[in-house]
Amino acid sequence: MNLRPLQDRIIVKRVEEATMTAGGLYIPETAKEKPQQGEVVAVGNGKRGDDGKVYPIDLKVGDKVLFGKYAGSEVKLEGEDFLIMREDDILGVVEK
């Protein structure tokens, strides 16, 4: 991917949810909501504070993150869908 986010922005690829329930029922595309979990694929350098210092982002490439339903801006790059969002849009990191 040839896109580098600026400042405190992060690029996230949504994690696809299963199309079958645990009971074996198929969930059609029209009934599924977009997942609110994804993987960080790129991070910016950090946010510049009022004092002029750059404060680094607490996330790194590969982190699994949770975000709000309406967080970020959707973009399509090289045939894939991504979200560009600010660090503040991230609700938490899923620990392994």
Curated annotation (Swiss-Prot):
Signal peptide: none annotated. Keywords: Chaperone, Cytoplasm. This is Co-chaperonin GroES. InterPro entries: Chaperonin_GroES, Chaperonin_GroES_sf, Chaprnonin_Cpn10_CS, GroES-like_sf. GO terms for biological process: chaperone cofactor-dependent protein refolding. SUPFAM superfamilies: GroES-like (SSF50129). GO terms for molecular function: ATP binding; metal ion binding; protein folding chaperone; protein-folding chaperone binding; unfolded protein binding. PROSITE patterns: CHAPERONINS_CPN10. The gene is groES. CDD domains: cpn10. The keyword RNA-binding does not apply. It comes from the Bacteria. GO terms for cellular component: cytoplasm. Heptamer of 7 subunits arranged in a ring. Interacts with the chaperonin GroEL. Belongs to the GroES chaperonin family. It is found in: Cytoplasm. Together with the chaperonin GroEL, plays an essential role in assisting protein folding. The GroEL-GroES system forms a nano-cage that allows encapsulation of the non-native substrate proteins and provides a physical environment optimized to promote and accelerate protein folding. GroES binds to the apical surface of the GroEL ring, thereby capping the opening of the GroEL channel. Pfam families: Cpn10. Its main location: cytoplasm. The lineage of its organism: Bacteria, Pseudomonadati, Thermodesulfobacteriota, Desulfuromonadia, Geobacterales.
